[in-house]
């Protein structure tokens, strides 16, 4: 019974999800239905948390909109998500960046992660 559930979950998982970590700036394009119209809405911000649970994986994105902090939790493999684009890689040392909720302005900035190349 468990193998059947795992197989069905594996089929429903998206394969085109880019690799991103907490601290990265991402743009998530989501399908929004307004009346009879269906359109794409972009949500761009910093990933502050990732929850890895297979098909039930989720991530939280935080942005500042009109001086107010807005957080949105996305299900990674949801059909509502059209695309996820990594805009900037952030250098952080923690898995959950909830401390950004209390910070504003320059103290809420995250350093950019530099890719190390092997010169041997």
Curated annotation (Swiss-Prot):
<dbReference type="GO" id="GO:0006412">
    <property type="term" value="P:translation"/>
</dbReference>
<dbReference type="InterPro" id="IPR008991">
    <property type="entry name" value="Translation_prot_SH3-like_sf"/>
</dbReference>
<comment type="function">
    <text>This protein is located at the 30S-50S ribosomal subunit interface and may play a role in the structure and function of the aminoacyl-tRNA binding site.</text>
</comment>
<dbReference type="GO" id="GO:0022625">
    <property type="term" value="C:cytosolic large ribosomal subunit"/>
</dbReference>
<dbReference type="Pfam" id="PF01245">
    <property type="entry name" value="Ribosomal_L19"/>
</dbReference>
<keyword id="KW-0687">Ribonucleoprotein</keyword>
<dbReference type="InterPro" id="IPR001857">
    <property type="entry name" value="Ribosomal_bL19"/>
</dbReference>
<protein>
    <recommendedName>
        <fullName>Large ribosomal subunit protein bL19</fullName>
    </recommendedName>
</protein>
<dbReference type="InterPro" id="IPR038657">
    <property type="entry name" value="Ribosomal_bL19_sf"/>
</dbReference>
<dbReference type="GO" id="GO:0003735">
    <property type="term" value="F:structural constituent of ribosome"/>
</dbReference>
<keyword id="KW-0689">Ribosomal protein</keyword>
<comment type="similarity">
    <text>Belongs to the bacterial ribosomal protein bL19 family.</text>
</comment>
<dbReference type="InterPro" id="IPR018257">
    <property type="entry name" value="Ribosomal_bL19_CS"/>
</dbReference>
């Amino acid at each position: 019974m468990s193998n059947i559930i795992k197989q069905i979950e594996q089929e429903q998982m998206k394969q085109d999800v880019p690799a991103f970590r907490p601290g990265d700036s991402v743009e998530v394009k989501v399908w929004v239905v307004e009346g009879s119209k269906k359109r794409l809405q972009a949500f761009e911000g910093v990933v502050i948390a990732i929850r890895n649970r297979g098909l039930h994986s989720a991530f939280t994105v935080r942005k500042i909109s009109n001086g107010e902090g807005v957080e949105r939790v996305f299900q990674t493999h949801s059909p509502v998500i059209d695309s996820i684009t990594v805009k900037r890689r952030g250098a952080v040392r923690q898995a959950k960046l909830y401390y950004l909720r209390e910070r504003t302005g320059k103290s809420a900035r995250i350093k950019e992660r530099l890719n190390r190349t092997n010169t041997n």
